[in-house]
Amino acid sequence: MFRNINPLGKFACILLVSLNTVSCVTETVDSPNAMKFSNAAVIAVQDPNIFVSKGSTFAWLPEAVHFYNDKRLENAPVKALIEKEITKNLLAKEVILVESVNGARFAIAYTAALESSLDDTAILRRFGLSPGNSQVPKDDSNIEKGSLIIYVFENKTNDIVWRSAAQAGVAFDMPMDERKVRIERVLAEMFQTFTVTE
């Protein structure tokens, strides 16, 4: 097509295509009622063939919970906050939490770690997910990338029904009230990807 057009015509075509491409702009507008999320990167996968419905029974699977302790966070009850928010978000989905995994249709567990204990390569290899948050500063010793992976299993088959991974910068000197709000936001964002049917 361009062989028969003179150089000025080619330039005009390229200019029109370029202007048309540049004029397509995406703008994000904050709604005053929208939930403000953390600066976490979140990714999730849910099996479309296994349906979780309201009223389904869930239980913790303690042997699949992996919380990597770090001395720099020893005064912050991060594990308790994560578990509280997982429970809160599950109940908001109108499922039923039971004490024993033997009496539940689904089991839930999680892994939480800083990058020094569990890096992106290990997360991808173990969980098949890679949120890939690269916005964490590398030159600040007060911040390290943290990862949280939540997984739901179907008890009878041991199939993974849903898994979600989030990554964000973890500031070691963050005040407790800010840390609590941040964990709440990250968990809310993760659970938005978990579909529960009527």
Residue spans of the language-model regions?
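Sec-dependent bacterial lipoprotein signal peptides
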Residues: 1-24
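A structural "domain/chain start" motif
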Residues: 23-81
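Surface-exposed short loop/turn segments
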Residues: 102, 106-159, 167
